[in-house]
């Protein structure tokens, strides 16, 4: 596995300790990490090609691969809202292409129950996926929050070869993260992880309570073997 960080959470201190993409790149280099992930709406000074190319070259100089560029997703809403979300995802693919990021992140939210909403959601993922196939960019579906069944359903129904799973250890339905460390007994997040680990192309490892020096709400002694047994060899 490769170890990296996600340049999204810019700190609760005011002003933030890390305020820009550049500061995150430097921090990742200081930690001697393998890669860095970006979020399209956080920390970038510009979306102009010259700036993006400079950012890519800085990462190369620091020995950092770029894992993915986080976009939006959550394909629910009016026709106008869905069109805007799809176009934003395509625009983020163009940015990812310049940066050298092989993938964009797309959220799925709470499992949809209405059949028509599900169909519209899938059509959006398919349209973005088709654009990605033209420009050479993959999509990573991030559970946020989801069940294992819903992740599998979306990926299978979208049916695009450039659609993988961005495995989020904390954002499952019923996760202890939503209730100050207390899991929902109606959901088994480790079963969801077992269901979906074989689909993972990238992992977001969440940490919520580490006062003791170990994560207390999420059990990584259970998660790492799940990933290893699935043959996972990607980024963490």
What feature does the model see in each segment?
Residues 1-101, 133:
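N-terminal pre-domain/capping segments
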Residues 96-116, 144:
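Active-site groove signature of glycoside hydrolases
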Residues 18, 35-36, 69, 126-225:
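Acidic/histidine-rich catalytic cores of soluble enzymes
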Residues 23-27, 50-61, 84-98, 120-130, ...:
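Alpha-helical scaffolding segments of alpha/beta enzyme cores, especially the outer helices
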Residues 16-23, 46-54, 80-88, 113-124, ...:
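Alpha-helix N-cap and loop-to-helix initiation/capping positions
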Residues 64, 101-102, 137, 230-234:
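A short helix->loop->beta-strand "cap" motif at the edges of active sites that frequently abuts
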Residues 11-14, 74-80, 110-115, 173-177, ...:
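A short acidic, helix-capping loop that chelates divalent metal ions and anchors anionic groups
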Residues 35, 103, 202, 234-235:
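Residues at the N-termini of beta-strands
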């Amino acid at each position: 596995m490769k170890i990296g960080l996600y340049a999204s959470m810019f700190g609760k201190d005011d002003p933030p300790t890390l305020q820009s993409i550049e500061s995150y790149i430097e921090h990742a280099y200081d930690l001697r990490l393998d890669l860095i992930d970006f979020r399209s709406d956080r920390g970038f000074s510009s979306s102009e090609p010259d700036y993006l190319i400079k950012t890519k070259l800085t990462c190369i100089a620091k020995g950092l691969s770029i894992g993915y560029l986080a976009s939006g997703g959550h394909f629910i809403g009016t026709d106008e809202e869905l069109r805007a979300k799809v176009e934003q995802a395509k625009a983020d693919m163009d940015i990812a292409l310049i940066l050298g990021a092989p993938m964009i992140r797309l959220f799925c939210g709470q499992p949809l129950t209405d059949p028509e909403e599900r169909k519209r959601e899938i059509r959006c993922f398919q349209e973005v996926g088709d654009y990605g196939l033209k420009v050479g960019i993959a999509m990573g579906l991030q559970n946020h929050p989801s069940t294992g069944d819903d992740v599998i359903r979306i990926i299978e129904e979208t049916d695009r070869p450039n659609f993988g799973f961005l495995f989020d250890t904390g954002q499952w339905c019923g996760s202890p993260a939503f209730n100050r460390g207390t899991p929902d007994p109606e959901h088994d997040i480790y079963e969801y992880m077992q269901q979906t680990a074989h689909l993972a192309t990238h992992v977001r490892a969440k940490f919520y309570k580490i006062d003791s020096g170990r994560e207390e709400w999420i059990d990584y002694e259970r998660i790492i073997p799940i990933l290893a047994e699935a043959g996972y060899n990607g980024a963490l």
